[in-house]
Regions:
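N-proximal low-complexity "stem/linker" segments adjacent to membrane-targeting elements
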Residues: 1-20
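Structural beta-sheet core signal
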Residues: 4-6, 31, 118
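Short, acidic, metal-binding catalytic loop of nucleotide-sugar glycosyltransferases
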Residues: 20-29
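Short, high-confidence coil segments that cap the C-terminus of an alpha-helix
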Residues: 26, 84-85, 113-116
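Short internal beta-strands
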Residues: 29-35
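Active-site-proximal specificity loops/subdomain of glycosyltransferases
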Residues: 37-91, 98-99
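Catalytic-site signature of metal-activated, phosphate-bearing donor transferases
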Residues: 68-73, 99-285
Length: 285
């Protein structure tokens, strides 16, 4: 059995898209609801959305300070620790995985046969037509609404693009789910290269398509920046907001550093042609 865990801390607009994307890959979708003073009724909102879906459940609800990404990571690790040998997918609500050959179960089968317990991945940033921060529509595929795939957040703000995507329950992840922590060592850079428990990224890596950048994201970036706290990584968000403001809140689709491929309207792993080049870059950062 393969289980997905997601922590929801703001809004439910993406949740139907998220569920429909992952249901074909996993057996269960487990939701941790992270309520804050800004979203005090989030549990009710999530409950309303998921009532018509099978095998989608709220498994824990907490009330914490807003934008504490370290607490979010603690929730992921806490839930996974209950079944240490089980396979888990972890993904934030705006993170949509694409797997090699579009087959998660084949990926996990390879891991079991080779004694790999961790699969890494990296962000591909999605943006609307013309580089715009488009308004999210409920009845149109996300891939069609945000057809442009690239790598702009790291060049703009130096936010870490590494992600730990698939793992057994005993594997802890670090803040932001960017690296695994094994025997008190993280898998950052050389510590993760050729690690015997990590599937080789050249053949077994996950594309994390980041549908963060809709019309509401600019205000959220500013709100996190204004918290001005290390636990919220506010300095990175401030840098991102500053860069977005400088570019008139529009992403340059022809900047070669951003590695854009345009018009990718289907959820296919093979769609983004420069993936091998990009993941090699990501794990070096």
């Amino acid at each position: 059995m393969v289980k997905l865990i997601t922590v929801i801390g703001h809004g439910v607009n993406l949740l139907p898209h998220f569920i429909e994307h992952y249901q074909k890959h996993v057996d269960e979708i487990n939701i941790a609801v992270y309520e804050t003073e800004l979203y005090p009724n989030l549990n009710e909102e999530v409950t309303e959305v998921i009532k018509n879906y099978e095998n989608v459940n709220i498994i824990i609800k907490v009330q914490e300070r807003i934008f504490d990404w370290e607490k979010v990571t603690q929730l992921y690790n806490f839930v996974k620790s209950k079944q240490k040998n089980s396979w888990y997918v972890i993904a934030d609500i705006d993170e949509f995985h694409l797997y090699p050959n579009d087959d998660l179960r084949e990926l996990i089968k390879d891991c079991e046969e080779n004694s790999w317990d961790i699969v890494r991945g990296g962000f591909i940033d999605r943006i609307g037509r013309g580089g715009e921060f488009s308004e999210l529509k409920d009845d149109v595929s996300l891939w069609e609404q945000f057809p442009n795939a690239g790598f702009f957040r790291y060049p703009m703000s130096k936010a870490c693009p590494n992600k730990i995507c698939v793992m057994r329950g005993y594997v802890d992840v670090t803040a932001g789910q960017h690296y695994a922590k094994i025997d008190d060592h993280t898998t950052w850079r050389w510590q993760g290269w050729n690690h015997p428990l990590i599937a080789p990224v050249k053949t077994h890596s996950v594309q994390v398509h980041h549908f963060k950048w809709d019309s509401t994201s600019i205000d959220r970036v500013l709100n996190v920046a204004n918290i001005n706290e290390d636990y919220a990584f506010s300095s990175e968000y401030f840098q991102m907001y500053k860069e977005l403001k400088r570019t008139n809140f529009k992403i340059d689709l022809v900047n070669p550093e951003y590695m854009f491929e345009l018009g990718l309207t289907k959820s296919e792993f093979s769609g983004y042609k420069n993936w091998n080049k990009l993941i090699k870059k990501i794990i070096s950062l």
